[in-house]
Amino acid sequence: MKTTISGKLLNGRLAVLGAGKIGGILLRAFLEQKLVQPKRVHATVRHAEKARSLAKQLGIQASTDNRAAVHGADIILLAVKPQAVKEVLEEIKPEMKPGKLIVSVVASVSTQLMEKQLGMDLPVVRAMPNTPCAIGCGMTGLAKGIHAGKDHLEIARAKGRSAQAFGGCCHPRRGVFAGLLVWDESPKARW
């Protein structure tokens, strides 16, 4: 029997902005684990040819139009390159409405910076998966922004854990998250 959160995930609309490497891995895991129906997904990539290929391969809607992807979405998985975040957030800002949740897997961009860029009280959760997450064996640190509540954090955690895409999940207290990122981004520290 599905929990309320799992039901929300299955029945919600998901936009994946940046369905390349990590965004693509997570999207495939969500679809394989049936956490979201393909007809409820709109993923974006930079090139139209890649969008057509992705749509055909996964049975989802795919395009190069971030604003169109976000329009009907309940959950937005932000998986673009760090240098593209400002431009993408500016592009989708007109479509952002109360009730939407942003889950970001973008490295080096804090929830505070995203909230400031959006200029509205929207929940943002940062999920920082490490490399072994590509095979479901990693660890993901979660940090909620100022407007995100425990329910938003739980949605992000449930989505990742259920898909086994995030490996294990942890929600370190404020101040410890930065240390987790340093550890994750330093391969020598793990070995």
Region roles according to the model:
Residues 68, 176, 186:
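Residue-level recognition of oxygen-bearing side chains
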Residues 1-64, 68-71:
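NAD(P)+-binding Rossmann beta1-loop-alpha1 motif at the extreme N-terminus of oxidoreductases
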Residues 19, 122, 126-134, 164-178:
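Mobile beta-alpha loop/short-helix "lid" or hinge segments that flank ligand
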Residues 113-123, 139-173, 185-191:
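Internal alpha-helical scaffold of NAD(P)-dependent oxidoreductase catalytic cores
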Residues 26, 48-49, 58, 66-71, ...:
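Rossmann-like NAD(P)(H) cofactor-binding subdomain of soluble oxidoreductases
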Residues 18, 77-84, 184-187:
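Short coil/turn residues that cap or connect secondary-structure elements
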